[in-house]
Every structure is written in structure tokens, then in C-alpha cells.
Amino acid sequence: MCYTLGFVTGVLFLLFDRSPFVRFHAVQSTLTFSTITALVILLPVLPGGALLSRVVMAFSIILWAFCIVKASRGEAFKLPIFGDIAEEQLSLNYT
């Protein structure tokens, strides 16, 4: 559920859920999808950035679906970079 609305649900679950598993996914979702959102908004400013922004958006949809499926199955997984940061923030070791 932390991935349902990208970083928005990540923030909500981080605030209201105490489960370490859910909190990890909430932080990971918030970091990942807020970064992607910023890229999609800022990239069109650069030359050729509009196309790159669309590529990032397509990638994010695939990543979003992947995260929803994995988390709904209760699987512990870390995304590169953001999973490590989430783990550090929560002082957990899932993988």
C-alpha cells in the first residue's frame, strides 16, 4: 500500500504505521517517487529533457508496478540507493 500513490502514500504510512516492514517501504517509496517526480518536473527545462522526462515517467510506471507487487506479497526488497538510505534511516537490515 505504501506505493499506491507514490510518495504521498509513503509519507502517510510513515506517519501512521509502526510496523518496521511498512515503515521501510514507506521511506523507500517516499525517497524513490519524490525523486522521480522532481526529475519529471525539472528535466523538460534542459535541451532534450522533454524526451528524457517521458522515459523517466515510463520507467517509473514499471518500477511502481514492480514495487506494488513485491510489497503486496510481503517480500522484503531494497531498491538500489533508496533502499540503502531507507534502511539507514530506520536502522534496519532487511536483505
Swiss-Prot record:
Cellular component, GO annotation: plasma membrane
Name of the protein in question: UPF0132 membrane protein AF_0736
Organism (species): Archaeoglobus fulgidus (strain ATCC 49558 / DSM 4304 / JCM 9628 / NBRC 100126 / VC-16)
Tree of life domain: Archaea
Transmembrane segment boundaries: 2-22, 32-52, 55-75
Record localization: Cell membrane
Coiled-coil annotated spans: none
Membrane topology classification: Multi-pass membrane protein
Main localization (coarse): membrane
Assigned protein family: Belongs to the UPF0132 family.
Keywords from the named record: Cell membrane, Membrane, Transmembrane, Transmembrane helix
